[in-house]
Amino acid sequence: MDKKELNKAIEKTVLKMALEPNNTEHYHELAKYYAMDNQYEKVISVYESLLEIDPKDLQTLLNLGSIWFYSKEYKKALKYFNQAMLVNPSNYLVYYNMANTYAELKNFPKALHYYNRTLDFNSQDPEVYNAIALLYHDFEDYVEARAYYEKALSLDPENLTALVDLGNVCFKLFDYNKALEYYYKVFKLAPDNKTVALCIANTLAVNKDKEKCYDYFEKAIALPGDNYKAYICYAIAKSDFKDYEDAAELYKKAVEANPNEANAYILSGNLYSNIKKYKEAEAQYKEALKINKLEPSIYVLIANVYYMNNEIERSIYSYRAAVNMRPENDEYKLVFIQVLDDFIEDYRKDDIIAAF
């Protein structure tokens, strides 16, 4: 339906509402058309008018709750979901939506409670088990997350979301071979999935399988989509395998892909610092500083390079800049004080020797 047809449908429905102001079907129809036109303020207004006619319209309560949920107005969402629960305490969608809302609010006990209530009414939906797994995943209980992802897959063996997330959980549990097993399944089902190709490549890198690792990075880069992250991950792998020149070139490609992002410059600087090319490292960090002028950690990185290159006075100035930006950061202060004390001690030692 194009814009012109949509406007005609809206006009026609408004006319029907004028003729039958208590017919809630017309309100649902008008709300649907406004939603198709992305006029969500009008959708809300129509639904609120509908509730004045029928305060127990379950679909309206659920729809309003969902609109506020996706607007990240979680307290407003809960208001309507709670009303929906009073209207129909046996509707699993009510509990599922409440659980999702509490999950966004990081309220683990209530989210888990309402997911379990959802299962009381719908125990065969893999998406509910996925959601519970994700809840445990977010709260870093990877063992429980794994169990629920496996339950989701027992109900839907080709559920791509569960396969990817289960691979991620296995990776975090250091079960890299199992992670690869799930990633490979996804890539077989969706060979154009760039993210999964990267997951496979990164896992192969951890497993020290250089040849296959590089092969999957090349596959990921060849797939459509932004390659900034792919170049960075590939560069890190190249660096880990001591292919430093290739790594440096990949960081350059990452910069070309997104010149306004500092991370590639910082990682490139770290690479040069690790191989003792301090001037090159300094240059990369200063490029990052042009993007994030007020980021104290970059000043610390520059200071570290100066210190390793035996430019102690310059390192002191950079450490002090970081401390001035984050005076509450004890780590910055401790490093600054230690370097300053060492510098003063060396300076005085020279004076004492000269006096003799």
Label each PLM-derived region with a short phrase.
Residues 24-25, 58-59, 92-93, 126-127, ...:
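Helix-start (N-cap) detector for alpha-helical repeat units in TPR-like alpha-solenoids
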Residues 28, 35, 62, 69, ...:
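Position-specific recognition of the canonical hydrophobic site in helix A of tetratricopeptide repeat
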Residues 29, 63, 97, 131, ...:
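Canonical tetratricopeptide repeat
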Residues 307-344, 352-356:
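TPR/TPR-like (Sel1-like) alpha-helical repeat modules
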